[in-house]
């Protein structure tokens, strides 16, 4: 069984939460919140993919 990578799991949950925030701000009709949530999704997803690439290059991922 493979070892669980908790940091990547945290990034995944943060991305899901950010996507949920987009829906909340759409319901509240808050353009600033929608834009902030979209920026947050891009930042979290980008950070997660960057971290995964670095870990793969270092041989920490299978």
Curated annotation (Swiss-Prot):
Coiled coil: none
Segments traversing the membrane: 7-27, 34-51
GO cellular component: plasma membrane
Keyword set includes Transmembrane helix: yes
InterPro entries reported for this sequence: DUF5325 (IPR035211)
Pfam families: DUF5325
Keywords: Cell membrane, Membrane, Transmembrane, Transmembrane helix
Signal sequence range: none
Topological relation to the membrane, as annotated: Multi-pass membrane protein
Location relative to the cell: Cell membrane
Tree of life domain: Bacteria
Broad class of where this protein is predominantly found: membrane
Designated name of the protein: Uncharacterized protein YlaF
């Amino acid at each position: 069984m493979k070892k669980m990578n908790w940091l990547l799991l945290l990034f995944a949950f943060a991305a899901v939460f950010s996507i949920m925030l987009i829906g909340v701000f759409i319901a509240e009709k808050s353009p600033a919140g929608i834009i902030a949530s979209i920026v947050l999704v891009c930042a979290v997803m980008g950070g997660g993919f960057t971290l995964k690439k670095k870990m793969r290059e270092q041989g920490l991922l299978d």
